[in-house]
Amino acid sequence: MAKVTMRQMLEAGVHFGHQTRYWNPKMGEYIFGARNKIHIVNLEKTLPMFNDALNFLGGIAAKKGTVLFVGTKRAAGDLVAQEAKRCGMPYVNHRWLGGMLTNFKTIKQSIKNLKDLEVQEQDGTFEKITKKEALMRSRQKAKLELSLGGIKDMRAMPDAIFIIDTGNEKIAIQEAKNLGIPVVGVVDTNNDPNGVDYVIPGNDDAVRAVSLYLSAAADAINEGKGSITTAVEGDEFVEEKAEA
């Protein structure tokens, strides 16, 4: 299963927390000390917790489950979309709309509207209506794509959510907890780890650190998916031998 190393985390700056005056005491057990008024995360604690989280995500993928990637702050958005697409998982990288999980029925209707508009744009409908109406529909489609494009193929509740910056995604965490959906999250020294099932203590601001979390998660998920193929091929091989 995909694993990260201490060297990778050091090079990515995972150990740099926030200014000491902003710390959350609940993160105290994961803090090694302070340097220049910046808390330093204890990577000896992060390493096994990060790898446990990766094993969990890979296990979900191995069972054909779904992991929803969530990271809506600007520094993470593009990377969230890139890595979620790489492992074929849904994502939210613009803004978390209240009810995305707890009111999924309504969200699915909005997704249907988005898909209808996509069809209209492709089948020439936009060319048959007035320019004003076509412009309105085009703007509506762009707005829906921004908010829902990453989850438009998500047909049911995810089996877990993977969050970059738990302090920025409190609504998503609360909705997941209300529905009993496990939460994997990067928790910096200024945030509250409560409500996160798989805590990854570390820097949630540095682009290199965010990239490491996301690429490692995508690798673990792809490996998990690969194990499905291997298992199926193994079963077929056994059946062929039995027939022979």
From Swiss-Prot:
Keyword Ribosomal protein tagged: yes
Origin superkingdom: Bacteria
InterPro entries found in the cross-reference section: Ribosomal_uS2 (IPR001865), Ribosomal_uS2_bac/mit/plastid (IPR005706), Ribosomal_uS2_CS (IPR018130), Ribosomal_uS2_flav_dom_sf (IPR023591)
One GO process term, biological-process aspect: translation
Protein name: Small ribosomal subunit protein uS2
Homology family: Belongs to the universal ribosomal protein uS2 family.
GO CC, any one term: cytosolic small ribosomal subunit
Pfam families with a match to the protein in the record: Ribosomal_S2 (PF00318)
Keywords: Ribonucleoprotein, Ribosomal protein
Single GO MF annotation: structural constituent of ribosome
PROSITE patterns: RIBOSOMAL_S2_1 (PS00962), RIBOSOMAL_S2_2 (PS00963)
Database matches in NCBIfam families: rpsB_bact
